[in-house]
């Protein structure tokens, strides 16, 4: 069976491909707005070296007038929203497969047929379903797990903590899929899709390493101890 983290990396690679395609498109759009020639050296580095341009990372890559135009005309909105949907898909896949990994590990020696039947009956329809199931079966309180993260000035991705970030991404995905557009979270520049994607990569990496140590080795990392203290201080029994 494919490991959750390996599947995530596979999906992550696909999302990164869309990010790079959006980057190339963005460079053409910005060059047209500025009435400049396209920087083919930058495009070649994106295509051949798996790099991204500063348009994804910093607000000062755009002028105020450019930011206004991008928001009004929505040049990057549709492709940025698809990056957010794909990011959510990768995250959801990881959480489902990780749950199965931990459940199978903790039920080793039990009737395999019953274990698999139990897993087949579990249905994760929303973020709170993951929160409840991880807490019930593994005493993992997802809202208390926080990774250090920051975005750039001018980016609309400004969650106060990791749980708020996950909720933002989940809601944006639902709005895009069911209503055609993200209503509360604006996707105007490449930063608005890059930073949610980059956050999920960091969150999954941290979650996988720290909870694997706890579940498989009964070892508490520094980040796990911080998570535990945070949960207990909020009255959560873990």
Task: Give the residues covered by each predicted segment.
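A generic structural signal for solvent-exposed, polar alpha-helical segments
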Residues: 14, 31, 100, 136, ...
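Intrinsic-disorder-associated interaction segments
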Residues: 1-11, 15, 19-22, 32-36, ...
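A generic signature of intrinsically disordered, low-complexity regions enriched in glycine/proline
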Residues: 16, 27, 43-48, 96, ...
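Terminal, compositionally biased low-complexity regions
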Residues: 1-47, 52, 103, 229-238
């Amino acid at each position: 069976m494919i490991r959750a983290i390996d599947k995530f990396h596979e999906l992550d690679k696909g999302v990164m491909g869309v990010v790079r395609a959006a980057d190339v498109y963005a460079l053409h759009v910005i060059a047209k707005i500025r009435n400049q020639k396209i920087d083919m050296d930058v495009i070649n580095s994106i295509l051949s070296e798996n790099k991204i341009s500063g348009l994804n990372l910093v607000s000062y890559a755009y002028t105020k007038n450019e930011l206004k135009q991008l928001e009004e005309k929505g040049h990057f909105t549709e492709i940025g929203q698809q990056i957010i949907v794909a990011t959510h898909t990768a995250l959801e896949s990881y959480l489902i497969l990780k749950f199965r990994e931990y459940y199978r590990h903790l039920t080793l020696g039990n009737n395999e047929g019953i274990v698999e039947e139990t897993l087949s009956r579990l249905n994760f329809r929303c973020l709170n379903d993951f929160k409840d199931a991880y807490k019930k079966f593994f005493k993992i309180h997802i809202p208390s797990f926080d990774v250090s993260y920051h975005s750039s000035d001018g980016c609309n991705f400004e969650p106060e903590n990791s749980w708020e970030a996950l909720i933002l991404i989940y809601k944006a995905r639902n709005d895009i899929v069911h209503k055609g557009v993200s209503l509360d979270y604006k996707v105007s520049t490449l930063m608005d899709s890059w930073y949610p994607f980059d956050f999920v990569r960091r969150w999954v990496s941290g979650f996988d390493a720290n909870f694997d140590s706890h579940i498989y080795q009964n070892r508490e990392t520094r980040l796990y101890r911080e998570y535990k203290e945070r949960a207990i201080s909020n009255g959560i029994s873990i």
